[in-house]
């Protein structure tokens, strides 16, 4: 029975990944044997399943049990600095897009991080003309998501296909919006300055059970703070989905 | 096989406490210490003072056995608890929910998706819907969003919807107000002791009335819309004691820029900021709003000013709803005190691209500017324009750069054309602005504070340098990604307009 609940790999639940990314990621298998040993006992199996069917859709049922199951993300990282405000994540001119409308949701994904200054960020997070990003993990510094309360910000990141941000700390409203929408896991690092050691395009794994971030390209391993009670809410798909799943509110709308 | 230890580990991790959002807001508040910038402002110091008991009226909420701050008390009452501690998560009854044209349609979408197409809002009199962001634009989606609000308000019979239909002439829309935070105050929706949530980060503006007010996202707002409640984490409180006579060349904007420069843009994350002291007591309601408006720029969850006779006077003709102010107990626990001698402060700016990038205005006198913008919830109120007019009047000169004036609300616009400016022999702001060569005050809205659609009035479409009375100077905030924004008080903005450089207003006010 132990195998009945396979460790869950969440990639993008919203958008199909490009085949390029899948290929690139499977080549990164080669890095795995160099992982530090203490983690092996915990995560060996999930890591295998994580890497092989990398962006195969996550098992859609089994989710109730999956509160305790693995949540792991793997792929290219996109690295930003301190105080990334929500105007840079999604500039205000695009706030006419309504996230609850599916086509506009997708459009928001294509615009994620379009407000970053080009001089400092020559590589776009989403290539022009595409709807989704080839980066699956965002790595940032202090106070990520500060500024405007626009929920469009975590939605744009989630809609782009990225599901996890790893930063030193978060602005309050952004963190809460990540959890409420279930769009993005906002994970905190134990140490500061990781973003300075990582480069956009590095291949990384974020393991929310072992609470660490592995930079395979650089051969480094960093501790993360546990996501805690927010994890199951995000995994369920946000506060409403979580509340239904756990019986806090009735399962169907009137 | 290997999955079983995993599952076990996992369940151990997650079985601790799985209530909804148990830690939604529990991400570490750990971020403050390591960002202290070195400022060249040695003269202006925030000194951490030993806890001092300000003279305050006793608690009005009965038992004082468990000392609480204002914010704790408001949340205790709203959650029907006799006492609570910072860090607790409580279900709070919301008094007013505000949304606007940028986040309203998404909130409505979530409300309908989750509660059903035919669901009714929890209380049609407690939801205030204010189109204000993208109004005077030909952007079809922006216009559609206002239509979505209108349809919803009709369907739900929402009592307070400040509609606009005739975009060609805002004055033809008697219901239209303009910038939500200022409209909330002017229309009597801000009341001491209450809980106000809004889908806008500057909802904290209403803390000026001694109430709890904070910004939330669409999903949370959709939840409130259906239930009237929200799970909130009780924040600990930082106390800011501002004493001393306010120099004639300073405004509340200087005070809040001083504070944000001191504690950084993350210095109050997850925390409440309470402002008191003799200077705060001397501030008008609009100035108190400026102070509270920008607490989110320090990461604050909310800001509060204790209600007093200034508050009650302001509310006299604005609301008939009974309210009950609350005050921090004498022995309430504040996690930190900051004390400022306001009489020693000087006019400030926040340099690009962060609101905590503080500098003295006079230190930036060599910064050449291309334009000045006076407007927004932070700096577009009647008194903000009065202050700018005072500088123009004192100088008797003309502006050297384009100067854009965007009144926050229709009421402010009327004031610009109707109220005489002190010492001007009866001239109005609009006359003074015209004589100084400013652009004619435009239709009230959020305008270019946040850039907005391309055809937004005064949007920064070129990489220019702007002195602005708004609240954020992030990359791209007012339009162009490479634009540079210096945040300043209306005095400093007007003085800068007159010289074409960032300018200390004492050059004209003394």
Regions found by a protein language model. Give the residues of each.
Chain B
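Fe-S-dependent hydro-lyases/dehydratases of central metabolism
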Residues: 2-510
């Amino acid at each position: 029975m132990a195998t009945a609940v396979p460790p869950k790999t969440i990639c993008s639940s919203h958008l199909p990944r490009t085949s390029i990314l899948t290929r690139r990621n499977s080549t990164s298998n080669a890095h795995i044997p160099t992982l530090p040993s203490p983690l092996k006992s915990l995560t060996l199996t999930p890591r295998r399943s994580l890497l092989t069917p990398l962006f195969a859709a996550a098992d859609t049922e089994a989710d109730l049990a999956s509160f305790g199951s693995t949540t792991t993300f793997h792929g290219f990282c996109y690295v930003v600095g301190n105080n990334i405000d929500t105007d840079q994540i999604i500039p205000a001119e695009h706030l006419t897009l309504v996230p609850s409308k599916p086509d506009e949701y997708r459009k928001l994904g294509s615009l994620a991080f379009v407000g970053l200054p080009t001089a400092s960020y020559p590589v776009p997070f989403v290539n022009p003309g595409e709807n989704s990003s080839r980066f699956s993990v965002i790595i940032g510094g202090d106070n990520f998501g500060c500024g405007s309360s626009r929920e469009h910000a975590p939605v744009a990141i989630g809609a782009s296909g990225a599901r996890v941000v790893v930063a030193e700390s978060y602005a309050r409203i952004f963190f809460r919006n990540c959890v409420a929408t279930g769009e993005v896991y906002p994970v905190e690092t134990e140490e500061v300055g990781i973003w300075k050691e990582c480069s956009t395009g590095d291949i990384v794994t974020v393991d929310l059970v072992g609470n660490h971030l592995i930079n395979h390209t650089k051969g480094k391993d960093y501790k993360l703070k546990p996501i805690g009670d927010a994890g199951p809410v995000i995994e369920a798909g946000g506060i409403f989905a979580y509340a239904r799943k756990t019986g806090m509110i009735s399962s169907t709308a009137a | 096989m290997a999955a079983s230890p995993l599952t076990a580990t996992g369940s151990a991790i997650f079985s601790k406490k799985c209530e909804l959002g148990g830690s939604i807001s529990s991400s570490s508040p750990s971020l403050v210490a390591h960002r202290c910038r070195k400022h060249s402002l040695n003269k202006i110091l925030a000194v951490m003072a030993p806890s001092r008991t300000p003279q305050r009226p006793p608690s009005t909420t009965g038992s004082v056995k468990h000392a609480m701050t204002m914010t704790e008390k408001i949340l205790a009452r709203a959650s029907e608890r006799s006492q609570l501690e910072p860090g607790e998560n409580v279900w709070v009854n919301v008094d007013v929910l505000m949304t606007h044209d940028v986040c309203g349609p998404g909130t409505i979408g979530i409300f309908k998706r989750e509660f059903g197409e035919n669901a009714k809002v929890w209380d049609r009199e407690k939801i205030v819907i204010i189109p204000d962001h993208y109004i005077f634009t030909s952007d079809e989606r922006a216009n559609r969003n206002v239509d979505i609000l209108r349809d919803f308000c009709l369907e739900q019979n929402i009592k307070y919807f400040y509609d606009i239909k005739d975009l060609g002439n805002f004055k033809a829309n008697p219901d239209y107000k303009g910038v939500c935070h200022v409209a909330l105050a002017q229309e009597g929706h801000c009341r001491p002791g209450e809980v106000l949530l809004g889908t806008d980060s500057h909802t904290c503006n209403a803390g000026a009335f001694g109430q709890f007010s904070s910004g939330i996202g669409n999903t949370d707002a959709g939840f409130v819309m259906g239930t009237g409640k929200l799970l909130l984490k009780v924040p600990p409180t930082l106390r800011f004691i501002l004493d001393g006579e306010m120099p004639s060349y300073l405004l509340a904007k200087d005070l809040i820029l001083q504070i944000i420069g001191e504690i950084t843009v993350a210095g109050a994350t997850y925390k409440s900021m309470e402002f008191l002291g003799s200077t705060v007591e001397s501030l008008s309601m609009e100035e108190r709003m400026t102070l509270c408006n920008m607490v989110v720029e320090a990461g604050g969850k909310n800001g509060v000013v204790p209600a007093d006779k200034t508050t009650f006077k302001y509310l006299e003709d604005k609301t008939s709803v009974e309210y009950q102010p609350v005050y921090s107990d004498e022995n309430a626990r504040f996690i930190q005190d900051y004390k400022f001698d306001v009489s020693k402060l000087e006019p400030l700016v926040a340099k690009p691209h962060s609101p905590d990038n503080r500098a003295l205005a006079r230190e930036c006198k060599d910064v050449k500017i291309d334009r000045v913008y006076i407007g927004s919830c932070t700096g577009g109120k009647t008194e903000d324009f009065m202050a700018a007019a005072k500088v123009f009047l004192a100088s008797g000169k003309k502006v050297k750069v384009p100067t854009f004036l965007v009144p926050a609300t229709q009421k402010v616009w009327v004031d610009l054309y109707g109220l005489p400016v002190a010492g001007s022999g009866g001239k109005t702001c609009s006359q003074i602005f015209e004589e100084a060569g400013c652009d004619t005050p435009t239709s009230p809205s959020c305008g270019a504070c946040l850039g907005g659609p391309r055809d937004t009035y005064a949007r920064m479409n070129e990489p220019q340098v702007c002195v602005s009375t708004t609240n954020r100077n992030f990359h791209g905030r007012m339009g162009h990604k490479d634009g540079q924004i210096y945040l300043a008080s209306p005095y400093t903005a007007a003085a800068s307009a007159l010289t074409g450089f960032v300018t200390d207003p004492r050059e004209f006010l003394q």
